[in-house]
């Protein structure tokens, strides 16, 4: 006779309070007492309401039968009690084993819950890190795009600067050509002016010599013409004529009509008498022509003096123009050289600045790539840890599942926290001293 175990009974609950053998014996004796009470009650009722004399034998037989039944029930209950005792001992041992298993499972559950909580915290950290990594990847992408754009703009600016340099070189070559031509023309003008100056100097010397000669001749003429007096000259001529041999010879000649010169003597004498006046008129004409020549020479001298002054003024003007042109050419050449030097210096400075910016951007991109590589390594480690945690949680022997709260919504990324995260990652991934760091392939 076995002990029936119902759903929800005392044996169906695992982890209930410990119940000893007396607990079940108490119920057994209760049932036995109840049966005895019922028997006694039946006997009392039979004795009160039944026919004792008639039914004594039958009642006795029935009582014997009931006693036998009760005895058999007692034997069955005794056997059942022994079976129950055995089962109780077995159940106690099973209970102890189950309790031990429950304690082990509880410890495993606590350990798994702690691991799950740690995994949940790691999952939250991993989620936050994913946000940071997404922000870093986006910033790296933006930096790469900006670097490409800046490379394009730098190339375009460099090409434009090269074009400007070429244009400036062409303009400088043109200006140098123009300056060379201007310089050659100025040198040619200078040479022509010098030749003209030499010619002017020669002409001036010749004119000076001619002037000196004219002055000397004028002085001689003036020295000769100043003491000349017409009346005195005529008187002197007459006296000279009277004192000369010609009148005396004419007076000594006779008037022979038959002489070949007789008829001519009167005319000759008259001609000789008029000779002083004729000589005076000739001398006067000569003096007038001499005065005219002197006036003409004076006018020519004044004209030459004026031409000399004009030539000197022209020479001074040409020298001033030459100096002015030379100064302008030198100033323009200096200005062009200064402008060319300034443009070249500006182009070199802009080129150096652009090269420096490109190097800085390349270094920054290299740092971003290194950080991204480190974050990828950290992400791989976190992923492997999370997979291990999930596999551990998904294993059996999890009697109690404690639901965790929902993952908090991600907050907007703070730049300061992002920089702090980068610093922590770099510090965590920084190798110890003496160990070389392998260069990243990115």
UniProtKB/Swiss-Prot annotation:
Extracellular side, ranges: 49-442
Known tissue expression: Expressed in lung, kidney, heart, aorta, placenta, muscle, pituitary gland, adrenals, mammary gland, bladder, lymph node, bone marrow, trachea, digestive tract, liver and tumor-associated endothelium.
Membrane topology listed for this record: Single-pass type II membrane protein
Cytoplasmic side: 1-27
Subcellular location, record wording: Cell membrane; Membrane, Caveola; Cytoplasm, Perinuclear region
Keyword Endoplasmic reticulum attached: no
Biased composition (Basic and acidic residues): 319-328
GO CC annotations, alphabetized: caveola; cell surface; extracellular exosome; perinuclear region of cytoplasm
Residue ranges of the TM segments: 28-48
Top-level division of the source organism's lineage: Eukaryota
Induction, as annotated: By phorbol myristate acetate (PMA) or VEGF in endothelial cell culture.
Coiled-coil regions listed in the entry: 57-77, 202-225, 280-387
Protein name per the record: Plasmalemma vesicle-associated protein
Native organism: Homo sapiens
Phylogenetic placement of the source organism: Eukaryota, Metazoa, Chordata, Craniata, Vertebrata
Gene behind the chain: PLVAP
């Amino acid at each position: 006779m076995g002990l029936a175990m119902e759903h929800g009974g005392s044996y169906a609950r695992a982890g209930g309070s410990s119940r000893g053998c007396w607990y079940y014996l108490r119920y057994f004796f209760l049932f036995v007492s109840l049966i005895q009470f019922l028997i006694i009650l039946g006997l009392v009722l039979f004795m009160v309401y039944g026919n004792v004399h008639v039914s004594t034998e039958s009642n006795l037989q029935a009582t014997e039968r009931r006693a036998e039944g009760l005895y058999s029930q007692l034997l069955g209950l005794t056997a059942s009690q022994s079976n129950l005792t055995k089962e109780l001992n077995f159940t106690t041992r099973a209970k102890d084993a189950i309790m031990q298993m429950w304690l082990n499972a509880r410890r495993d559950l606590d350990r798994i819950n702690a691991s799950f909580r740690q995994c949940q915290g790691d999952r939250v950290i991993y989620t936050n890190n994913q946000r940071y990594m997404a922000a870093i990847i986006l910033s790296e992408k933006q930096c790469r795009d900006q670097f490409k754009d800046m490379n394009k703009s730098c190339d375009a600016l460099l090409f434009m600067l090269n074009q400007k340099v070429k244009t400036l070189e062409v303009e400088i070559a043109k200006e140098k050509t123009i300056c060379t031509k201007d310089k050659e023309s100025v040198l040619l003008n200078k040479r022509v002016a010098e030749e003209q100056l030499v010619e002017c100097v020669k002409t001036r010397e010749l004119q000076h010599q001619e002037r000196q000669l004219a002055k000397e001749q004028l002085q001689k003429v003036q020295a000769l013409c100043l003491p000349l007096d017409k009346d005195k000259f005529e008187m002197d001529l007459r006296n000279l004529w009277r004192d000369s041999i010609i009148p005396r010879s004419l007076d000594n000649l006779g008037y022979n009509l038959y002489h070949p010169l007789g008829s001519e003597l009167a005319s000759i004498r008259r001609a000789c008498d008029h000779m002083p006046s004729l000589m005076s008129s000739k001398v006067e004409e000569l003096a007038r022509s001499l005065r005219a020549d002197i006036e003409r020479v004076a006018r020519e001298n004044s004209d030459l003096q004026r031409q000399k002054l004009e030539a000197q003024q022209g020479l001074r003007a040409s020298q001033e123009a030459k100096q002015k042109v030379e100064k302008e050419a030198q100033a323009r050449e200096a200005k062009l050289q200064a402008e060319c030097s300034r443009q070249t210096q500006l182009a070199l400075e802009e080129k150096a600045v652009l090269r420096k910016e490109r190097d800085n951007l390349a270094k920054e991109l290299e740092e971003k790539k290194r950080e991204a590589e480190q974050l990828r390594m950290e992400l791989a480690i976190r992923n492997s840890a999370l997979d291990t945690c999930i596999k551990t949680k998904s294993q059996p022997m999890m009697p109690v599942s404690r639901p965790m709260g929902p993952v908090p919504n991600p907050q907007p990324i703070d730049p300061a926290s992002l920089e702090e995260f980068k610093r922590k990652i770099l510090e965590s991934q920084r190798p110890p001293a003496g160990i070389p760091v392998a260069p990243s392939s990115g």
